[in-house]
Amino acid sequence: MKALAKLERAPGLTLTRVKRPEVGHNDVLIKIRRTAICGTDIHIWKWDDWAQKTIPVPMHVGHEYVGEIVEMGQEVRGFAIGDRVSGEGHITCGFCRNCRAGRRHLCRNTVGVGVNREGAFAEYLAIPAFNAFKIPPEISDDLASIFDPFGNATHTALSFNLVGEDVLITGAGPIGIMAVAIAKHVGARNVVITDINDYRLELARKMGATRAVNVARESLRDVMADLRMTEGFDVGLEMSGVPSAFTSLLEAMNHGGKVALLGIPPAQTAIDWNQVIFKGLEIKGIYGREMFETWYKMVAMLQSGLDLSPIITHRFAADDYEKGFAAMLSGESGKVILDWTV
């Protein structure tokens, strides 16, 4: 089958032919329709330090997808041939303390599709049926293909009660931008997002941001004054992994505020702990999606009117993957979709 793979320990990916995956007793085989390019895939493309330490070579990658079940293992129940599915990209052990307690997103033995094992940038993907998630007919293939990052945004944004709250999001990548729409959809009052990329900030405005702030030109304190915020933000969502952004977020938080961290800062990042301790801040780390409560919430929000369509900005045939990666690398894109049906 056709697949997009890392064949050499060097930048780039290669469209190649690989063996169609075998289907285990508890697996489903998915014929891929659409995939989306993730920031993780950009790290793999660039072959940065993280990728060099993490990605097996050779291996085809990718983990954001939607497709149709075409084969099932003999032990699979609850699915049928022809079901349209996306899937949870974190494959968990099922036996550790957290898995047994229903907290599979905290499994200490997680294996990542397209990171630690063969991925979805291919004509077919085999995954455990437990990880497959049926997509309702009213949700498009394009939207279903971005459920993985949409889930990251949902898990992060809905970690705390947002109704009537003032929310600060640092980092206007696709996940941060989707978090804007989620926060507004569930009843936040002011949703402010910061970045230095004007293209992405404009996307955030289209998704409903109260203010989208280029911090290279505008003061967050001035924006807060314009919004008549006298006490600080109630909820902070750090999506960038940039130390200066995290610092500014902590400074802007109200006493008793709650902070969710999805962005990954450098390991030795220093912060002013006075901001955390004396403000009584609650900080929560976010990894992946809650299985499968996050997935149900994603579907429910889309069915109740959440509009994510502006975040999908580019579409290419899978054979034109280089154009898709170029769009992502340019910094002037939202989500980029690759079509495996043409």
UniProtKB/Swiss-Prot annotation:
It catalyses: L-threonine + NAD(+) = (2S)-2-amino-3-oxobutanoate + NADH + H(+). Its EC number is 1.1.1.103. Keywords: Cytoplasm, Metal-binding, NAD, Oxidoreductase, Zinc. Pathway: Amino-acid degradation; L-threonine degradation via oxydo-reductase pathway; glycine from L-threonine: step 1/2. It is found in: Cytoplasm. One of its GO terms (cellular component) is cytoplasm. The active site is at T40 (charge relay system), H43 (charge relay system). InterPro entries: ADH-like_C (IPR013149), ADH-like_N (IPR013154), ADH_Zn_CS (IPR002328), GroES-like_sf (IPR011032), L-Threonine_3-DHase (IPR004627), NAD(P)-bd_dom_sf (IPR036291), PKS_ER (IPR020843), Zn_alcohol_dh (IPR050129). Its cofactor is Zn(2+). Binds 2 Zn(2+) ions per subunit. GO terms for biological process: L-threonine catabolic process to glycine. The record marks D148 as: Important for catalytic activity for the proton relay mechanism but does not participate directly in the coordination of zinc atom. Zn(2+) 1 binds at C38, H63, E64. GO terms for molecular function: L-threonine 3-dehydrogenase activity; zinc ion binding. NAD(+) binds at I175, D195, R200, L262, G263, I264, I286, Y287. Signal peptide: none annotated. Zn(2+) 2 binds at C93, C96, C99, C107. Catalyzes the NAD(+)-dependent oxidation of L-threonine to 2-amino-3-ketobutyrate. Belongs to the zinc-containing alcohol dehydrogenase family. Homotetramer. This is L-threonine 3-dehydrogenase. It comes from Burkholderia multivorans (strain ATCC 17616 / 249).
